Amino acid sequence: MSAESHPTESQMTPKKLFYLTLGSIGVVYGDIGTSPLYAFREALKPVAHDGLTRFEVISLISLMIWALTIIVTIKYVLFLLRADNEGEGGTLSLLALLMKTANGHTAILMLLGLLGAALFLGDAMITPALSVLSAVEGLKLVTPRLSEYIVPISVVILALLFVVQSRGTGAVAKFFGPITAVWFLVMAAAGISHISDDFGILAAFNPYYAVSFLLHEGFYGVVVLGAVFLTVTGAEALYADLGHFGRRPIQWAWFLLVFPSLTLNYLGQGALVLGKPETMSDPFYLMYPQWALLPVVILATAATIIASQAVITGAFSMVRQGINLGFLPRREILFTSETNTGQIFVPSVNAVLFIGVIFLVLSFKTSDALATAYGISVTGAMVVTSIMAFEFVRARWNWSLPVAVIALAPLVILELIFLGANLLKIHDGGYIPILIATAFTVIMWTWRRGTAILMEKTRHTDIPLASFVSSIERKSEHSPAQVPGTAIFLTSDPESAPAALLHNLKHNHVLHDRNVILTIRTVNKPRVPSQDRYKVEQISERFSRVELLFGFMESQNVSQALATLRKAGLKFDIMSTSFYLGRRKLVPDANSGMPYWQDRFYILLANAASLPSDYFHLPANRVVELGSQIIV
């Protein structure tokens, strides 16, 4: 289900609401739905070093339930789902919205947004590795002889998952929701069946246990919080996938199925450990009888594959947003569905994620080891989102400063505590998500900054378009020869004569019957209605200026968009139209405004970018490229 296809809240029929709710269970809640596989197990380890007490077990479950309540229910389900950018959610969508109203702190907001996006991309590497490993590890309970095959089996599953990305998931995506719904029901049933082991576990609903535990445990309490946070990993997907399903389906799925199922399962795990402390080694799988283990492992593996698919798709979508907003160089984007433009495949991103995921599996080998590295990227992304949400309620909802502080400061403080708890795990692998996020942030910041410097340098040597057209339209003996047809010159600055136009005149001494100065601009909203797609200005008899507007969630298909210009009186015969593009050779300069290494890195990114003709879907046999050299 795509954002392009779901109706508005008021138009949603009960049937549509049901299918969107079911779909959201697989895509939105797949990640958080796999947390019971390892969250409670990891939380038990720091407190079980000197024996496990009844108070500690109840307190851990209490911490998990209240983490789900405060962070997921209150922050995401009830609050953030309303902070949308024309129906879209996610870090970059929120950043695009805030950039419209940023007053004096644009750079800080941008850096925060880029950091949040980078942390999400790091999460997209860790989630598949951790989820699949934790599911496949159930095989060692089926038969210990399979223990040595857990890593190879996980690698094969993940390799197949990334290989099939290029073929799209449309054919099987309709099963994601039902399979994940069954997964939640199975978890709920297991939890219910074991709560009777010790009804005392129901005391976990009392926040006294959570608070008292933290106050009495001291350092160990902080360490435990890092593991407790695994309970809410995947919550960012609620906001990121807002545009795919809408607010109501996501909320209904949470309150009717996901939240109750997770709560019941954690209560069941807690009751099991209270009754049988020896089960703390793997309380999730040990809730099931021996005959049910293999089916549950298979179902768990399917659920983790679906969760991994959702986060991979989210990474593709975020990269497309980043490219359209100018934070990333153009990359090849393929569409895997003829009817759903939301189903995309980005080969370069798929390759990077695949290499990263396999590296993590082979390096950490167990979900225990990998879980220590998981929380940092998620907590970091949540803190960034909360800070940006503070700016949102001030700028868009006009909340006063005291109201915004009272409402959001407790959330930010809580998440900072969780972040601090996770940072304690840096030496145990927590440095991995930090390195990944740093790398992606440097890439995006370098591209954004380098492009701004490049624009500034070219602006100094540009000729105003109005002056150029005025001079060229004066008939004289030096006037260039006129040739039939249409020439379209792509430029990022509609006020200046494109470099390709100047080079064409300089080297070929010709001018076409009709010349279109074309600018492609991405606006800070998800989509642009077809009637607002273009702006046309007739400069002279032979020159016109056209601006094509795209939302950051849209494919920038220029050939298709130009066809809509017929309504404005501009008709293009593709066989007599040539597209002129400027190709720049960039030379590093130590005094450009960026360090020399960053200049070199920017040039590397620029050289690796997809060709404009490919990215903008221009007919290859109608494209002419003219080069120039620029020092950056």
UniProtKB/Swiss-Prot annotation:
GO cellular component, one term: plasma membrane
UniProt keyword annotations, A-Z: Cell inner membrane, Cell membrane, Ion transport, Membrane, Plasmid, Potassium, Potassium transport, Symport, Transmembrane, Transmembrane helix, Transport
Family matches, as InterPro entries: K+_transporter, K_trans_C, K_trans_N, Kup
Molecular function terms from GO: potassium ion transmembrane transporter activity; symporter activity
Pfam family, one: K_trans_C
Cell compartment(s), UniProt: Cell inner membrane
Transmembrane segments: 17-37, 60-80, 106-126, 146-166, 175-195, 210-230, 254-274, 292-312, 344-364, 370-390, 401-421, 426-446
Protein topology in the membrane: Multi-pass membrane protein
Catalysed reactions listed for this entry: K(+)(in) + H(+)(in) = K(+)(out) + H(+)(out)
Purpose: Transport of potassium into the cell. Likely operates as a K(+):H(+) symporter.
Family: Belongs to the HAK/KUP transporter (TC 2.A.72) family.
Protein name per UniProt: Probable potassium transport system protein Kup
Native source organism of the sequence: Rhizobium rhizogenes
Gene expressing this chain: kup
